[in-house]
Every structure is written in structure tokens, then in C-alpha cells.
């Protein structure tokens, strides 16, 4: 199967997993990126079975609306049963690197609210150690140079993602060459840097369920 076919298969597995648990009051959290887009397109076929969705980015909100799925502000939602999103890297502890699409902060907020965080990815995203994929860090623009210097002290090589402005009006530094050992500790250290909004390590709140699309079918990992 091609990579797109693997993404579609794992997106279908996520739909199949949540559908029996949805009702006409259910609101689904939806992530951002190519795999999440497959999930949206497949979920839309069942839009009569749930109330609507919370989007982790403006792009996702637009895609949901195009399918006729109501999009809710997270502040108006009292309960979020599921959040489904992709990842740039994942390990066996279901800790993730996310943010290749620059939506990491809103993704992290929705994941924090959801009872169950389901990560969907093709099998190539499963790694022994996180960090080969550059770690995105969302930064207040005026703090960019300061944050970059602090990230160097942590052993990284930050690169400004030129021309990218997040939905929150901030900029992204992609941190290369980080050897990520204990991911929750590093996530906290980076978040403590003044000027950092959030970073793409999802380790303090990892996924609850990881669905991996492989040539042998969809594999399931849980915490």
C-alpha cells in the first residue's frame, strides 16, 4: 500500500473505534494534517451520528464545515470524549512529536481536554527514540532570539520556520539534533523558557491509543 492508503486505513480504524461510542450529543476533537484530513473525510459519512466537532486549527475547521459538520468553540464544550490526530513521531510509550503543521498549541489544548486521545499514523512514524524529526516550538515573535539561545543550551539546533505564522499569531522554531531521553522532563524544561507558548512534545499528556497503518494491517498500541 502507498503511504496515503496506509493513512486512509488507519483513519478508517479510528472511525470504526469511536463510532459505536458516539451519540447525538457527542462532540469529537479533530486534529490537523494529512492523516487527520483522511479521518475527517471518513467521519463525515457518519455525521448524523454525532453532534459536531472541535477543530485544532483553522484549516481543520474549514474542512469540517465543508463536509457540513458543525464546529464548536472549545469554550462552549463541557465534555470531549475523543480527540483524533496524527503525529510526526511516536514511541512505544505513546509519547509523540507533533507540530509539523504548526498547529501544536491548539492540538495540545484539545488533547488535554479529551477523555481519550487517539493518535493515527502510518507505521513509519513509530521510532525507538524521539528526536529525528525536528521538534517544533511555538514562540512569541519578540522572544524568538532569546528562546533560540536557550534551546541551544539544551543541546538543540533551532531553525526559524521562515514565512510561517501560527493560528495564534506566533512563530515556529524547529529544533534539530535533540536527543530526547525522558520526554516529559524535556517538555517541561522547554515550556519553562520565557517566550515559549508550547512545544511539540506530547509526553506529559501522551496518546491513550496509537493506531498504526502497516503493510500487514492496522496495529494497535495502548498505554
Swiss-Prot record:
Catalytic activity: aldehydo-D-ribose 5-phosphate = D-ribulose 5-phosphate
A GO MF label: ribose-5-phosphate isomerase activity
PANTHER family attached to this UniProt entry: RIBOSE-5-PHOSPHATE ISOMERASE (PTHR11934:SF0)
Organism listed in the record: Stutzerimonas stutzeri (strain A1501) (Pseudomonas stutzeri)
NCBIfam families to which the protein is assigned, alphabetical: PRK00702.1, rpiA
SUPFAM superfamilies to which the protein is assigned, alphabetical: D-ribose-5-phosphate isomerase (RpiA), lid domain (SSF75445), NagB/RpiA/CoA transferase-like (SSF100950)
Binding site for substrate: 32-35, 85-88, 98-101, 125
Subunit structure: Homodimer.
Descriptive protein name: Ribose-5-phosphate isomerase A
Family: Belongs to the ribose 5-phosphate isomerase family.
EC number(s) from the headed UniProt entry: 5.3.1.6
Key word Isomerase present: yes
Amino acid at each position: 500500500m502507498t503511504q496515503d492508503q496506509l493513512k486512509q486505513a488507519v483513519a478508517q480504524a479510528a472511525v470504526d473505534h469511536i463510532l459505536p461510542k458516539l451519540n447525538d450529543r457527542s462532540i469529537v476533537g479533530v486534529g490537523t494534517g494529512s492523516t487527520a484530513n483522511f479521518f475527517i473525510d471518513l467521519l463525515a459519512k457518519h455525521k448524523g451520528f454525532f453532534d459536531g466537532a472541535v477543530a485544532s486549527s483553522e484549516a481543520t475547521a474549514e474542512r469540517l464545515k465543508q463536509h457540513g459538520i458543525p464546529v464548536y468553540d472549545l469554550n462552549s464544550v463541557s465534555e470531549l470524549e475523543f480527540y483524533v490526530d496524527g503525529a510526526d513521531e511516536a514511541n512505544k510509550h505513546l509519547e509523540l512529536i507533533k507540530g509539523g503543521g504548526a498547529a501544536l498549541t491548539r492540538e495540545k489544548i484539545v488533547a488535554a481536554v479529551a477523555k481519550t486521545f487517539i493518535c493515527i499514523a502510518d507505521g513509519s512514524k513509530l521510532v525507538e527514540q524521539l528526536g529525528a524529526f525536528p521538534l517544533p516550538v511555538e514562540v512569541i515573535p519578540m522572544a524568538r532570539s532569546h528562546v533560540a539561545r536557550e534551546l541551544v543550551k539544551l543541546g538543540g539546533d533551532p531553525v526559524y520556520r521562515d514565512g510561517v505564522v501560527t493560528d495564534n499569531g506566533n512563530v515556529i522554531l524547529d529544533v534539530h539534533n535533540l536527543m530526547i531521553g525522558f520526554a516529559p522532563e524535556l517538555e517541561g524544561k522547554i515550556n519553562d523558557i520565557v517566550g515559549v507558548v508550547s512545544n511539540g512534545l506530547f509526553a506529559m499528556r501522551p496518546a491513550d491509543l496509537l493506531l498504526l497503518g502497516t503493510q500487514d494491517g492496522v496495529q494497535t498500541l495502548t498505554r
